[in-house]
Amino acid sequence: MRHRKAGRHLNRDNAHRKAMFKNLAAALFREEEIRTTVPKAKELRRVAEPLITLAKEDTTANRRLAFARLRDKEMVTKLFEELGPHFKERPGGYMRILRCGFRKGDGAPMALVQLVDREEAIAARRETEEDAEETAEA
């Protein structure tokens, strides 16, 4: 019996599940928006949100904890230098899960997982890219 056992198994063993969520979290931090199944999206929230909370305070110890979970230096750097400061004032709820229909092959319910306030970040990034292009042309 699995009474009072938290979390979803998702038909995978423990190592596969950990690797999958590590990769999903890294993809979410890299792209800031991913498409996956609804159960994976809901479970991803339990993995990714604590990492963003950890990134709000940039210390060596927190970077090591994040690296232990992600195993990707590039994503840890982005997490602590971009996402952490971006969500500094937000007390939680860094992700948005939007249902987006069903997968064609097997009918699995799909979801779009986004980081909240993503539009502002994209607009700011576009402005800096445009400024960089203008200075490069001059």
UniProtKB/Swiss-Prot annotation:
One of its GO terms (biological process) is translation. InterPro entries: Ribosomal_bL17 (IPR000456), Ribosomal_bL17_CS (IPR047859), Ribosomal_bL17_sf (IPR036373). Keywords: Ribonucleoprotein, Ribosomal protein. GO terms for cellular component: cytosolic large ribosomal subunit. It comes from the Bacteria. One of its GO terms (molecular function) is structural constituent of ribosome. Pfam families: Ribosomal_L17. The keyword Cell wall biogenesis/degradation does not apply. Part of the 50S ribosomal subunit. Contacts protein L32. Belongs to the bacterial ribosomal protein bL17 family. NCBIfam families: L17. This is Large ribosomal subunit protein bL17. It comes from Halorhodospira halophila (strain DSM 244 / SL1). The lineage of its organism: Bacteria, Pseudomonadati, Pseudomonadota, Gammaproteobacteria, Chromatiales.
